Amino acid sequence: MIVVATDAPLDARGLKRLAARAIYALARTGSTYSNGSGDFAIAFSTHTTNRVTAAPGAQQRIVLPTDSVSGLFEAALDATEEAVYNSLLQATDTTSNRQTVRAIPIDELKALLKKYGR
């Protein structure tokens, strides 16, 4: 599960698009997708005009124009990609009753990322 938080004034449509970009970041890290993989993302905004209030009548809302969200999309991609790598690099060797899965060798990962321009 990926959670994307922003203080940008996005409406439901913009937040849905932002969450989708976070999923794209998994592909950057080599993730594969299949039926039942369970990969999903949600996004929310903390912008003050998105808050529900008890004030009577219609509330004015500020929404970032569609043509102004590319920077947010890139930021969601970059932050998600970094979070995946941070998680992988904090892993330790894990042993079950059948096998041991070794932690990723950080130096080898750095070399691979450099080789492929990441």
Regions found by a protein language model. Give the residues of each.
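A structural signal for small-residue-enriched, beta-sheet-centric alpha/beta enzyme cores
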Residues: 1-118
